[in-house]
């Protein structure tokens, strides 16, 4: 039996397992010097600071069957009293959050048209945050924010939008010219 000294920083907690079992009363240890008895006790560090996960660009199909690409960020942090769940309930919470966020984004975007997606960024952020927070709560995580970095329609949709804006400018110019000639 060897004593092992662990230094736990202010922003960390140490999940301690004695003979492979986590004890709710004594298993989660706070900041300071912590002595473990090896090989009977092992530990996992849990960082309590807010973390940002970049969700890679996702291709989604809107309700009106238009392709759209979205990049976004998820801000999350462990719930302090439930931090041990990050070790006990999920193997790799980063991958789990990315997978869940991708699925939730597809569901949200699939219910909207392209025009709604382009004009309602805040609503999309909030819908994803609320749904993701409900799911990650069982792992001891709190989703504090979701921020869409970029929304990019497929090239053919961008071309159609550019043609529409150009036609609108020409229409306004013709109306202005006709009003000028009438006077």
Question: PLM features: what roles do these ranges have?
Answer:
Residues 1-182:
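N-terminal hydrophobic membrane-entry segments
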